[in-house]
């Protein structure tokens, strides 16, 4: 089974971007 690199990157971005966004908001709120 071939791994679709573009699909993998898209999935990674879909997970990482909101996570980073929430982390930034949390840090700004905490400090």
UniProtKB/Swiss-Prot annotation:
Keywords, alphabetical: Membrane, Photosynthesis, Photosystem II, Plastid, Reaction center, Transmembrane, Transmembrane helix
GO cellular component terms attached to this protein's record: photosystem II; plastid membrane; thylakoid membrane
GO-annotated biological processes: photosynthesis, light reaction
SUPFAM superfamilies to which the protein is assigned, alphabetical: Photosystem II reaction center protein M, PsbM (SSF161033)
Transmembrane domains' residue ranges: 5-25
Subcellular location: Plastid membrane
Tree of life domain: Eukaryota
Topological category with respect to the lipid bilayer: Single-pass membrane protein
Signal peptide range: none
Subunit structure, as described in the record: PSII is composed of 1 copy each of membrane proteins PsbA, PsbB, PsbC, PsbD, PsbE, PsbF, PsbH, PsbI, PsbJ, PsbK, PsbL, PsbM, PsbT, PsbX, PsbY, PsbZ, Psb30/Ycf12, at least 3 peripheral proteins of the oxygen-evolving complex and a large number of cofactors. It forms dimeric complexes.
Family: Belongs to the PsbM family.
Family matches, as HAMAP family: PSII_PsbM
Biological role stated in the UniProt entry: One of the components of the core complex of photosystem II (PSII). PSII is a light-driven water:plastoquinone oxidoreductase that uses light energy to abstract electrons from H(2)O, generating O(2) and a proton gradient subsequently used for ATP formation. It consists of a core antenna complex that captures photons, and an electron transfer chain that converts photonic excitation into a charge separation. This subunit is found at the monomer-monomer interface.
NCBIfam families, alphabetized: PS_II_psbM
Protein known as: Photosystem II reaction center protein M
Species in which this protein is naturally found: Cuscuta reflexa (Southern Asian dodder)
């Amino acid at each position: 089974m071939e791994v679709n690199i573009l699909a993998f990157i898209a999935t990674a971005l879909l997970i990482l971007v909101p996570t980073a966004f929430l982390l930034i908001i949390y840090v700004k709120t905490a400090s």
